[in-house]
Amino acid sequence: APALQDERRYAAGMLGQILGDSEGSRFYWSLVETGIAEEAQAQYDGRDGVGDFIVYASCGPEDAERVEDLLRQESARLADSLQEDDLVRVRSKVATAAALQGELPGGRMRRIGQRWTNLGAYRSLEEELAAIDAVTLQDLRDTAAAFPFEWTVTGTLDPQPE
């Protein structure tokens, strides 16, 4: 995934939300709403010089293989399934979260500190919202193509045998 210094971080964050937000995402509808998993999420984690997409789910051991298959299927088809209404919904979610975080002193200071530490520059909330609003459907598709959800590490936590 793109690094924090890469402007594609906005699209990457939105892709993570579309794929695996706790409500209304691809994972939510295919895994949580259907009762196959208790929880299934994906997120973008941008860092200094590197970024990752993190995917996880919680389910019973008897459903683990099926859940992993569905996670992989949804991840693989994300880029081809993106629609304009996905962009409208996620843009609204991300902008609202940024605005709410900006209203709290701790959230505002955390954002300022992270931006300064990682980017060496200050960006106002208005500039941040403009960058979110500037993301297009093609940006989402291009970012998904440049940074596909390829699984490099997979781990499981199983119940202890009795």
Predicted segments with their positions:
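Short acidic alpha-helix initiation/capping motifs at coil-to-helix transition points
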Residues: 6, 66-69, 118-123
